[in-house]
C-alpha cells in the first residue's frame, strides 16, 4: 500500500511540474526579485504587498505563491522561531533569484547579467503548446513535412527562428532573451578558471552565436584565438559583420559548419 501511495505521489509531481515554471514566470512578471532587492535583500509580506502590482483583493494569495517559490528554491523563507503570525515571515534572495534582479543600480548588476528575459522566453506559451503537441506530432505520418518538422512547428506554424523573423515584437523579446543568456555565459567563459578549456586552441566557431556576445568575450579574454560566429543570414547584418575581433559567417549549421579547432554550441 505504501508503495502505491508513493507511486501516486510521483505521478502528481510529474502532472503538476509545470507549476514551477508558471510560478517562476509570475515572480518575474510581478518583479518580486527586484522588490526584495530594493528592500535590502529581505522583505516581509506587507513590504511585498506595498511594492508589487497586486490587486488588494488578491494579496492573500501572495504568501501562497511565495511559499511555493521558496520550496522550489527560488526564494528563501525565514519563519520566526517565536511563532509570530504569517506577516512576520520574511523572504530573501537565493543565488537563483539574484540572477533575476535587473536593477541597473544594484550591486549585483555589476557582478552578473540578469536572466529574467531569458527565463520569460523559456516559459513562453509557445514552448508549452509545442510540448502538448508531442504525442500528435509522433503519431502524424501524413502531414506536410515542412509544416510538421518539429512539435514546435506543428503547434505554432513556424520554427522558433521563423517566428522571431516574422513577428517583430516576439523577435525583439527573443533577441534580448538569447543575448542575456549569452552575456551570462560569456562572463563565465572569460574567467581564468576556464582557461584550461581553451588551452592550445587557435580558432573557434560559435554556432548559432547570435550577436556575437559570447565570441567577443572569448576573443577579448584570449586574443590569440581567431573567433567566428555562424548564424542565419537574417541574423547577420552589416552592423554585426563590422565588429572587428569576430568574423560573422552567414549560413545554416544543418548544412555547413566552418572549420576550426573547436566548435561552441550553447544550449
Task: Name the predicted role of every residue range.
Residues 43, 247-250, 267:
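Short, low-complexity, polar/charged sequence segments that are solvent-exposed and flexible
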Residues 263-265:
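A conserved beta-strand element that flanks and buttresses the S-adenosyl-L-methionine
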Residues 201-256:
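Class I SAM-dependent methyltransferase SAM/SAH-binding core
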Amino acid at each position: 500500500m505504501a508503495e502505491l501511495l508513493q507511486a501516486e505521489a510521483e505521478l502528481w509531481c510529474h502532472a503538476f511540474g509545470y507549476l514551477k515554471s508558471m510560478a517562476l514566470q509570475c515572480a518575474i512578471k510581478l518583479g518580486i526579485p527586484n522588490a526584495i532587492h530594493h528592500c535590502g535583500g529581505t522583505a516581509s509580506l506587507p513590504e511585498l504587498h506595498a511594492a508589487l502590482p497586486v490587486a488588494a483583493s488578491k494579496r492573500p494569495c501572495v504568501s501562497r505563491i511565495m511559499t511555493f517559490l521558496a520550496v522550489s528554491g527560488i526564494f528563501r523563507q525565514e519563519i520566526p522561531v517565536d511563532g509570530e503570525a504569517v506577516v512576520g515571515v520574511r523572504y530573501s534572495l537565493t543565488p537563483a533569484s539574484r540572477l533575476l534582479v535587473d536593477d541597473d543600480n544594484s550591486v549585483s548588476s555589476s557582478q552578473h547579467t540578469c536572466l529574467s528575459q531569458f527565463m520569460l522566453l523559456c516559459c513562453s506559451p509557445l514552448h508549452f503548446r509545442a510540448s502538448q503537441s508531442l504525442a500528435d506530432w509522433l503519431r502524424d505520418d501524413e502531414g506536410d513535412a515542412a509544416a510538421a518538422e518539429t512539435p514546435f512547428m506543428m503547434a505554432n506554424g513556424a520554427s522558433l527562428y521563423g517566428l522571431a523573423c516574422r513577428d517583430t515584437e516576439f523577435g525583439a523579446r527573443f533577441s534580448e532573451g538569447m543575448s542575456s543568456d549569452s552575456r551570462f555565459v560569456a562572463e563565465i567563459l572569460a574567467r581564468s578558471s576556464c582557461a584550461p578549456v581553451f588551452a592550445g586552441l587557435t580558432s573557434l566557431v560559435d554556432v548559432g552565436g547570435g550577436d556575437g556576445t559570447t565570441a567577443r568575450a572569448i576573443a577579448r579574454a584570449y586574443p590569440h584565438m581567431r573567433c567566428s560566429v555562424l548564424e542565419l543570414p537574417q541574423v547577420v547584418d552589416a552592423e554585426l559583420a563590422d565588429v572587428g575581433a569576430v568574423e560573422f559567417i552567414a549560413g545554416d549549421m544543418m548544412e555547413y559548419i566552418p572549420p576550426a579547432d573547436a566548435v561552441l554550441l550553447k544550449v
